[in-house]
Each structure stands twice: as structure tokens, then as C-alpha cells.
Amino acid sequence: MFFINILTLLVPILIAMAFLTLVERKILGYMQLRKGPNIVGPYGILQPFADAMKLFMKEPMRPLTTSMSLFIIAPTLSLTLALSLWVPLPMPHPLINLNLGILFILATSSLSVYSILWSGWASNSKYSLFGALRAVAQTISYEVTMAIILLSVLLMNGSYSLQTLITTQEHMWLLLPAWPMAMMWFISTLAETNRAPFDLTEGESELVSGFNVEYAAGPFALFFMAEYTNIILMNALTTIIFLGPLYYINLPELYSTNFMMEALLLSSTFLWIRASYPRFRYDQLMHLLWKNFLPLTLALCMWHISLPIFTAGVPPYM
């Protein structure tokens, strides 16, 4: 029974990830005044499945000098971590109701750094190693602000469980009282998922394709799937934390519909940003975090810590 539960969680995620690639190509196409994919199936709707068949039927080539085991483990680990992050998300009921759901997400997302580092090192190519080092530095740096923002949210939520965020946001989205943090969180999720304008890991002019430059066929598809699964996950997490969907006990389907619509809108914003903005310079990316975001998030975190202490003597109002 538990296996069926896992399948009912993972299969829709993989289908959503497949169609996100199509939506991205369509949005980029229309923003550049062209059609995008429109040959395979009606309106190009079968394009993701055609791409998947092509990638998984190709022979997985690899350079002779690669470290075989790490070369194969890295993409597998990447997708496994991307899918396991969905376990504690309330939609409205999580697969496993973890008391420390937010900590689980933080810990698991920071493990994804290893798959990037291993893939860059195992490829035995200087381009992929440079791309991997860039990605690791960027991911670790932006995780610092994300952790501090999550800490501030926990103080408002009063629990490490993601489930209680539904109750916390019954009357008002946390986006309204904590909008500066929501803005910084959204930009940090862009950097965390290595999306434009922070896609410095795959700067074509200097790094060819980044840490996955030596990958082809199946292993490359696994990296690709992990990236898009992470995009949907980050937007789902943003929805749960800052845009708590409506929840009626008698009508849980309404929560799921609301949740999906908000996550879809945020994912579309990711694609819109990709079509609109040029890539950052690497030093600007790091300055944005260490000189702007970090002091701001620390100050806001101190504010959220001190607020309950200051208002401890004030009677609650109904």
C-alpha cells in the first residue's frame, strides 16, 4: 500500500516536470515571436515524450578517463534527492507527516551539492569541474539566506512542521507581513535551482555546458529531470510558506487545486524571468548575497525573534 502511495506522489510529479519543459519552450517561443514545438502531436503536446524516448534510447557515451562509479552515481543521486524532497510537503496531506519537515527539506537540498560536485570531478574535464565549483559555491551561499528566512518563518509558525503553516495562514498569507523576506526567498530559489539570471554554471561562452558537459543520453536526462523537478518543488515550497492556499476540512480538493494553480503561476514567473533577463556576472551574484541579502535577512530574523518577546505582555485579541 505504501508503495502505491509513493507511486501516486512521484508519477504526477514526473509528468508535471515533463510538461514544464514543453511550457518553457512554448513561453520562450512566444516571447521571441515564434511558435515553439508544434509538430509532435496536437500543438506539440507529445514533444516531452519524444524527447524522453530519444534520450533514453541513445547510447550513453562517456570519456575513457572518467571515474565510472561516480559518473553514474551523480545523476542518479541528483534525481533521487529531487524526488525525495516532495515527501513532507502538505498537499494538503503529506506522504510522511514529519515533525521536522522544514529541517528535512534543508538537509536534503544541501545534499544535492554532492551530486553536482561528483559529476564535475568524475567527468575529468576542466570545463565540468569549473562549472561544478561555481554551482557548489552558488548553491551553498544562497542556502545560507534561505535557512535564515526559513528560521524567521518558523518563528511566525511556531513549529518545524510544514502542516501547521496551513493553520498559520488561515486568515492572512505570510507574504503580506513578511514581503521583503518573500522577495529575497524567491530570488534565492532562482539561484538555488541555477536558473537564469543566475545560470552561471552553464555559461556557454566560457564553460560550454557546465558540470554536465560530458554527459549524454540517459544520465544527461536524469540531470535535466532533477533540475526541472527542483524548480517545481521550490515553487511548491514558496506556495506553502508564503501563499498558504485555502483549506476547508470538508473540501481538501480545493486546497490541492489552489496549491497547483499558485505553484504553476510561480513556475511561469521563473520562465518569464529566464526570457527577460541577461546573466549576472559571478562577482555580482556573490555580492548580492553576502553584502545585501545576508545583512537584511539577519536584521529581519532579529526582528522576528524580538517581536514575540516585546509583545509577550500584550493580551491576545480575537
UniProtKB/Swiss-Prot annotation:
It is an enzyme of class 7 (translocase). GO terms for biological process: aerobic respiration; mitochondrial electron transport, NADH to ubiquinone; mitochondrial respiratory chain complex I assembly; proton motive force-driven mitochondrial ATP synthesis; response to hydroperoxide; response to hypoxia; response to xenobiotic stimulus. Belongs to the complex I subunit 1 family. The keyword Translocase applies. Keywords: Electron transport, Membrane, Mitochondrion, Mitochondrion inner membrane, NAD, Respiratory chain, Translocase, Transmembrane, Transmembrane helix, Transport, Ubiquinone. GO terms for molecular function: NADH dehydrogenase (ubiquinone) activity. It catalyses: a ubiquinone + NADH + 5 H(+)(in) = a ubiquinol + NAD(+) + 4 H(+)(out). Its main location: mitochondrion. Core subunit of the mitochondrial membrane respiratory chain NADH dehydrogenase (Complex I) which catalyzes electron transfer from NADH through the respiratory chain, using ubiquinone as an electron acceptor. Essential for the catalytic activity and assembly of complex I. This is NADH-ubiquinone oxidoreductase chain 1. Its EC number is 7.1.1.2. Core subunit of respiratory chain NADH dehydrogenase (Complex I) which is composed of 45 different subunits. It comes from the Eukaryota. The chain crosses the membrane at residues 2-22, 70-90, 100-120, 136-156, 171-191, 231-251, 253-273, 293-313. It is a multi-pass membrane protein. It is found in: Mitochondrion inner membrane. Pfam families: NADHdh (PF00146). GO terms for cellular component: dendrite; mitochondrial inner membrane; mitochondrion; neuronal cell body; respiratory chain complex I. InterPro entries: NADH_UbQ_OxRdtase_su1/FPO (IPR001694), NADH_UbQ_OxRdtase_su1_CS (IPR018086). PANTHER family: NADH DEHYDROGENASE SUBUNIT 1, NADH-UBIQUINONE OXIDOREDUCTASE CHAIN 1.
